[in-house]
Curated annotation (Swiss-Prot):
InterPro entries noted in UniProt: RlmM_FDX, RlmM_THUMP-like, RNA_MeTrfase_FtsJ_dom, rRNA_MeTrfase_M, SAM-dependent_MTases_sf
UniProt-recorded name of the protein: Ribosomal RNA large subunit methyltransferase M
Active site (UniProt): K290
Keyword Methyltransferase: yes
Organism superkingdom: Bacteria
Subunit and partners: Monomer.
Main location per the UniProt record: cytoplasm
Protein task: Catalyzes the 2'-O-methylation at nucleotide C2498 in 23S rRNA.
Compartments (UniProt record): Cytoplasm
Disulfide-bond pairs as recorded: none
Provenance organism: Halorhodospira halophila (strain DSM 244 / SL1) (Ectothiorhodospira halophila (strain DSM 244 / SL1))
Recorded GO MF terms: S-adenosylmethionine-dependent methyltransferase activity
Family classification: Belongs to the class I-like SAM-binding methyltransferase superfamily. RNA methyltransferase RlmE family. RlmM subfamily.
Length: 339
C-alpha cells in the first residue's frame, strides 16, 4: 500500500520544530515532500507526492505518528462513517480503528465526538470489509474538525493522539511521577526497565516523585537534593537522602540507574549525563533537558550527539507530561539486558 506521507501529533506550539525534524528525517531517507504545519494546531502532516513514504520514524517532537493514506474533507453529518469506509483504499486490510483529535485548544472539544463516533465507524468498517480489527495494526483517523479527517495506518504502539492514560497515584509526592512513568513505557524496552533489587541515583530529587516511583518498583535510591523529601520518603530505609549539589555528587560504586530532573541549561545537563556514562558511574540514565525558546531542535541534536560520544545509545521524546522540555533515555552499550 502506498503511503502518501506522515500524520504526526505534537505538543501545541512545537509544530514548526516538528516540521523541521520531519523534513530532515525524510531527506535522510531520500523521501521528497513538504510539511503542512499550522501554529497551535498540535499536529503536522508531511506530504510525499510520489507515494513512496515509509512508516514514520521515531521523532523527538512527535507524540504519535502514522503513515498517511488519505485526507477526507467535506464529510457529511449523516452517514459520515459510511463515507469514510467507502473512501478508504481496499489495501488498508485489517486494523483496529482509533478516532483521534489534536491536543489543542481547538481540538480538545472534539474528544466527545471522537468517543461517540468510534462505535459507528467500527460498524461501518466491518460492514464494508475494510477492516476486521487486527490488534497488531492501527487505522488512525485524525479529525481537525468533525467534517475533515486524515487517515493513517501504523503499528499498535502508543496511545490515541499520543496521550497516555496514566492515573496519578494517591500517595505520590508530586505529579512528576507521571513523567517518569510515561518515559518508562515509551522510551525504555520492557526487558530494560527498572526492576527490584537495582540501585538508582536521583539527582534533583525533592520532593521525591521520581524516587517514589523507583521505590514502588523495588529499587533502592540515593536521593540527591539540598531540599527536603516528602516525609514518607525521608523515613524510608530504602532511600538515602544526601543534601548536596547534583553537579558535585559522585557515587561510591557503579549504579544501575541515574535519573535527573534538574532545572538547568540543557548543555550543562548533557555534559553531566555524558560524564556519568563515560566514567561508567551508571549503566542507564533517564533525564530531562529544558528547551530554549530558539532553535530547540539543534539543542536536542547536540545534546544527543554528546551523550552518544560515550558509546551509549540514546533516544528522546517530548512526552505528553513534558512541557518546554524533552526526556532522554540512554544506556551504555556494554550493559547487559535482563533476559
Amino acid at each position: 500500500m502506498e503511503l502518501q506521507g506522515w500524520i504526526l501529533h505534537c505538543r501545541a506550539g512545537y509544530e514548526q520544530t516538528l516540521a523541521s525534524e520531519a523534513t530532515m528525517a525524510a531527506h535522510e531517507r531520500d523521501v521528497h515532500g513538504y510539511c503542512r504545519a499550522r501554529a497551535q494546531s498540535a499536529y503536522v502532516v508531511f506530504h510525499a507526492p510520489a507515494g513512496d513514504a515509509p512508516l514514520p520514524p521515531q521523532l523527538v517532537f512527535a507524540r504519535a505518528g502514522a503513515g498517511l493514506i488519505g485526507e477526507l474533507q467535506g464529510l457529511p453529518e449523516g452517514g459520515r462513517a459510511e463515507a469514510i469506509a467507502a473512501a478508504l483504499p481496499p489495501a488498508v486490510g485489517s486494523a483496529t480503528p482509533w478516532v483521534e483529535h489534536p491536543d489543542s485548544d481547538a481540538g480538545r472539544p472534539l474528544a466527545r465526538f471522537c468517543r461517540r463516533f468510534t462505535g459507528p465507524l467500527r460498524h461501518a468498517l466491518t460492514q464494508t470489509g475494510v477492516t476486521s480489527g487486527d490488534p497488531q495494526r492501527r487505522l488512525r483517523l485524525l479529525f481537525p474538525d468533525s467534517r475533515h479527517c486524515f487517515a493513517g495506518i501504523g503499528p499498535r504502539e502508543g496511545w490515541p493522539s499520543g496521550i497516555p492514560r496514566l492515573r496519578m497515584p494517591r500517595n505520590a509526592p508530586s505529579r512528576s511521577v507521571l513523567k517518569l512513568e510515561e518515559a518508562l513505557h515509551r522510551l525504555v524496552p520492557e526487558n530494560e526497565r527498572p526492576y527490584p533489587g537495582e540501585h538508582a541515583v536521583d539527582l534533583g530529587a525533592a520532593p521525591g516523585g521520581w524516587t517514589w516511583l523507583l521505590r514502588e518498583r523495588g529499587l533502592t535510591v540515593t536521593a540527591i537534593d539540598n531540599g527536603p523529601l516528602a516525609p514518607a520518603l525521608a523515613d524510608d530505609p530504602g532511600v538515602e537522602h544526601q543534601r548536596t549539589d547534583a553537579f558535585r555528587f559522585r557515587p561510591r560504586t557503579e549504579v544501575d540507574w541515574l535519573v535527573c530532573d534538574v532545572v538547568d541549561r540543557p548543555q550543562g545537563i548533557a555534559r553531566l549525563m555524558t560524564q556519568w556514562l563515560r566514567e561508567e558511574w551508571a549503566r542507564a540514565a533517564i533525564f530531562n533537558l529544558k528547551l530554549p525558546m530558539r532553535r530547540p531542535l539543534e539543542t536536542v541534536r547536540q545534546a544527543l550527539d554528546a551523550v552518544r560520544t560515550t558509546g551509549a545509545r540514546a533516544h528522546a521524546a517530548q512526552l505528553y507530561h513534558d512541557r518546554e522540555e524533552i526526556t532522554v533515555y540512554a544506556r551504555r552499550m556494554a550493559s547487559r539486558n535482563r533476559p
